[in-house]
Amino acid sequence: MSIKLIAGNWKMNTSLEEANQLIDEIIKNLEDGDLSAEKKVAIIPPFPFIDLVLNKIKTIPNFYVGAQDCSPFDNGAYTGDVSAKMLKSLGVEYCIIGHSERRLHHQETNLTLSEKVEQALNNDIRPIFCCGENLEIREANQHIEFILKQLYDGLFFLPKEKIVKTIIAYEPI
């Protein structure tokens, strides 16, 4: 049986008050809809609002919270980083890794992303591994090779039992 995941990334948007209103609206809309066992919803708020969202959705079946990123490190003197262990202790189930905006604005390499994937999996968090090409690469007809390299460098070091726990999100830029 294939399970569908619908994930909503809030990016760096909303104040605390807006986040509260937004999650209430999402919950109301989902309660009015069809959220069966074959469908899961993951809300991926900014870090400061993870706990707020978790507390609001904890009794709703098939409704989960994800993180927008995690550190490639388990712990230590990495100011501003949030470890997968910390995220799991909150109750986070999913983590976006390799989003095009982080690759671009934070110069994240495939090696760094592979370390983040490993951290997520080691802490029982399902990575949502993003891959995709920009228009220039697509128009040059190099998109297949480009995406395969992202996947190979980011995931193919993993054993099969860990790869199958990873969700791949294709996001052309």
PLM feature spans:
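Active-site loop-to-helix "anion-binding N-cap" substructures in soluble metabolic enzymes
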Residues: M1-I173
